[in-house]
Amino acid sequence: MGLFAVIDIGGTSIKYGVINEDGTLLETNDRDTEAYKGGLSIIEKVKDIIHELKINNDISGICVSTAGMVCPKEGKIVYAGPTIPNYTGVEVKKILEEEFNLPCFVENDVNCAALGEFFGGAGKGTHSMACLTIGTGIGGALIIDGKVLHGFSNSAGEIGYMMVNGEHIQDIASASALVKNVALRKGVEPSSIDGRYVLDNYENGDLICKEEVEKLADNLALGISNIVYLINPEVVVLGGGIMAREEVFRPLIENSLRKYLIESVYNNTKIAFAKLKNTAGMKGAYYNFKENFNK
């Protein structure tokens, strides 16, 4: 085996490329998902991408990371929300293996991003990791001894639905929640500002932005403390656009964690920030392929 097609299907864009056995991306590109056209349209687009990659590369396998709840054994979309209509039930693995006569393995996008960070990023060298992606919502993944914890019905790690202070954590600690709350207090449309605006103004001393950023960090820390008490991971990795501002969030989250974790647990809890950025999903899709192909 030599080269592999890696596909990362998100709600906005499909990132793709070719990776070698060492986990080095040799080429990458992206195109619009056009999710509104539905799940089968996306799969047709993925087929076109792989056909293109095969023109100049001897592809030995197909590695897919995708939005939605995935049954990794069947490579099937168990559930996808309204952002990708008619995606639930699509048998991604079966369709692509029949089209290309190549092995294909499929995994949830947050799990793939976590695998990427575990094997080649912020979690490298550890044995257990929790990964939270802070974006429009909050995605989560749990890795124990190098393997994604899927749970009985493949819903382990759906951290965004965890109840914190009486609400789903993604409704009070996501980037979209931060923007919405700041916009509401300032009397502007949420579409007129973004996370960068909030964080820039936080650093410039804006009181509203300061209060809302601190509130988000505290809610996030409370959620992290629940995860830590439950599975005691060696490291908690935080990713997503706003978490690129580690200098803002690290001190806030760590200060709040001191409130929520007993001292002995706090002292053994490491917070890290994602390193791989946009390539995490593609690299994780390859690590998932390698793990399953070698079983």
Swiss-Prot record:
Q: Which SUPFAM superfamilies match?
A: Actin-like ATPase domain
Q: What is this protein called?
A: Uncharacterized protein CPE0188
Which organism is this protein's natural source?
Clostridium perfringens (strain 13 / Type A)
Q: Report the sequence similarity comment from the record.
A: Belongs to the ROK (NagC/XylR) family.
InterPro entries per the UniProt record, alphabetical = ATPase_NBD, ROK
